[in-house]
């Protein structure tokens, strides 16, 4: 409730502190990321996955830029998105508000942790974050920086939590009385597993479908 009722100035302050502290701790972040990359090499992780889990100067610059852009956006809370007079003296308003507690489960992308955390802070939502084991060290230091920034901004410490153990996924799936929404990011089979093993509403996805339509009068070799 405190986070949902916080001012946009306080939430923006937290975001700016996150950006500032990410810059200040860049060397430590890169060092922890090297540990994840070394472990991935030992475990013979696929090259595509290793590319995603790498967190370098470019990705740090991108996430900080994203945070600054988020700060520049207006407050998403308390906006009247629909107003309708139902009867004399009776007006129905639809007002934007936080969802509540969002559980986000994602795979080997440490930059996703920063992006998700930032979006939750701006929108006044509490978050429970579970990243892939491939990015354990990077996620740990990134979360610590974000968590410390939240506290320094005066927001409650428990508005952002991190789950590290794989066993905690099933525990999270059972929290239908306290978690309002789950967002799994990963393979189709992973998303289907989440959807099939929880009573919590899931914002999931299936396999992407891409189509190309070519007019019969056009040369396919030019169109494709």
Residue ranges of each PLM-predicted region?
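ALDH superfamily catalytic-core signature
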Residues: 108-111, 115-126, 141, 145, ...
């Amino acid at each position: 409730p405190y986070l949902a009722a916080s001012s946009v100035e306080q939430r923006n302050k937290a975001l700016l502190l996150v950006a500032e502290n990410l810059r200040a701790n860049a060397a430590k972040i890169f060092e922890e990321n090297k540990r994840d990359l070394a472990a991935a090499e030992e475990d013979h992780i696929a090259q595509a996955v290793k590319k995603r889990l790498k967190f370098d100067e470019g990705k740090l610059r991108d996430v900080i830029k994203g945070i600054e852009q988020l700060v520049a956006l207006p407050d998403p809370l308390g906006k009247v998105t629909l107003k309708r007079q139902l009867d004399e003296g009776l007006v129905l308003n639809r007002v934007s508000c936080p969802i509540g507690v969002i559980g986000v489960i994602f795979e080997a992308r440490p930059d996703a942790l920063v992006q998700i955390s930032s979006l939750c802070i701006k929108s006044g939502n509490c978050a429970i974050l579970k990243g892939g084991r491939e990015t354990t060290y990077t996620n740990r230091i990134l979360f610590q920086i974000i968590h410390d920034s939240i506290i320094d901004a005066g927001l409650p410490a428990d508005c952002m939590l991190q789950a590290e153990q794989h066993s905690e996924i099933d525990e999270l799936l059972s929290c239908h009385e306290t978690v309002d929404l789950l967002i799994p990011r990963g393979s189709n089979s992973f998303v289907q597993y989440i959807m099939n093993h929880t009573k919590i509403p899931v914002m999931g996805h299936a396999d992407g479908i891409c189509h190309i339509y070519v007019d019969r009068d056009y040369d396919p070799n030019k169109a494709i």
